[in-house]
């Protein structure tokens, strides 16, 4: 029964908005609560799996070779050690089919992918790696690197993701993929007489699911400052939103609800609603 399920993780090769909406509709029909079902693609599952292993396995870059289908796919995980949190990027490539002399072909592909990089570990997944055909290619991969062979990496990565997201475990990484938000949005607000930044949107979250909302009391001029920061940068720029056609009231008697809803991975729609006079519920 779904009431016994704390988090349901779903991982799939690719995501799009139509698929997400249909899946969310099915989950609502099955009485899953909002936030109980989390969806991610295979790339994100690889990211969570690789960085949930022992630190020495991702001291440098990590490479995945996926031979599940007829084509040999590769994915390289890179960490930016100069950002906080560390920004993770994945470089994916379709290397085509392995025909005759598979061992030599795969060795050539591996050499091209790894060239110029320091790689700590390599993961080999998919039925295509079955059999005893890897000889020189495996010897090359195992030189100064850890190599792992298996078939359930994506499902395990989804489980790691569910644990990390649900338990709010310390996670010093942020993954910026095709479906992840490429910006942070903040509001500068006064909380208990202390000026703080309130996070509306967080980079690295899936733009399909992310939403930010808060209620504030307007103090002073009718305008809102939105601070926008790219995850790879320590600098932020400010967008000033002027609130026009508002009812004039005395200072600190205007209550606003601010809602941020992503429209893509790099575009966010902000709606500001005048709630009138009163206390914040």
What does each model-found stretch correspond to?
Residues 56-73, 78-80, 126-129, 176-182, ...:
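A short acidic Gly-Thr/Ser loop motif
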Residues 38-55, 147-190:
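Glycine-rich phosphate-binding/hydrolytic loop that grips phosphoryl groups
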Residues 22, 131-142:
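Conserved helicase motor "Helicase C" RecA-like lobe of SF1/SF2 P-loop NTPases
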Residues 1-18, 93-107, 112-119:
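Conserved phosphate-binding loops in N-terminal lobes of ATP-dependent enzymes
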Residues 76-104, 280-281:
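Short glycine-rich, Thr/Ser-proximal phosphate-binding strand/loop in the N-terminal lobe
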Residues 15-18, 69-72, 100-101, 128-132:
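Short acidic, S/G/P-rich loop/turn micro-motifs used as interaction or catalytic elements
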Residues 11-13, 121-130, 158:
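Glycine-rich beta-strand-to-loop/alpha-helix junction loops that act as flexible
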Residues 1-62, 192-262, 271-281:
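Nucleotide/phosphate-binding catalytic cleft detector across ATP-hydrolyzing
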């Amino acid at each position: 029964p779904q009431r016994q399920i704390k988090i349901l993780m779903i991982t799939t090769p690719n995501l799009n908005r139509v698929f997400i909406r249909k899946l969310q509709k099915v989950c609502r029909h099955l009485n899953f609560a909002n936030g109980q079902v989390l969806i991610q693609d295979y790339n994100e599952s690889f990211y969570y799996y690789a960085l949930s292993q022992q630190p020495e396995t991702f001291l440098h870059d990590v490479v995945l070779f996926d031979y599940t289908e007829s084509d040999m796919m590769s994915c390289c995980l890179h960490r930016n050690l100069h950002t906080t949190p560390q920004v993770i990027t994945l470089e994916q490539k379709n290397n085509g089919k392995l025909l005759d002399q598979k061992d030599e072909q795969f060795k050539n592909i591996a050499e091209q992918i790894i060239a110029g990089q320091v790689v700590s570990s390599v993961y080999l997944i998919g039925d295509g790696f079955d059999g005893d055909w890897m000889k020189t290619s495996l010897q090359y991969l195992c030189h100064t690197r850890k190599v792992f062979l298996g078939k359930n990496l994506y499902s395990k990565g989804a489980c790691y993701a569910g644990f990390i997201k649900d338990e709010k475990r310390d996670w010093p990484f942020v993954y910026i993929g095709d479906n992840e938000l490429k910006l942070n949005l903040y509001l500068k607000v006064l909380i208990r007489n202390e000026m703080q930044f309130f996070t509306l949107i967080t980079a690295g979250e899936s733009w399909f699911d992310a939403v930010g909302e808060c209620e504030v009391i307007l103090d002073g001029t009718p305008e809102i400052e939105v601070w926008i920061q790219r995850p790879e940068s320590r600098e932020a720029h400010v967008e000033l939103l002027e609130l026009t056609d508002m009812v004039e009231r005395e200072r600190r008697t205007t209550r606003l609800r601010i809602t941020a809803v992503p429209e893509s991975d790099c575009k966010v729609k902000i709606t500001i609603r005048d709630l009138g006079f009163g206390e914040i519920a």
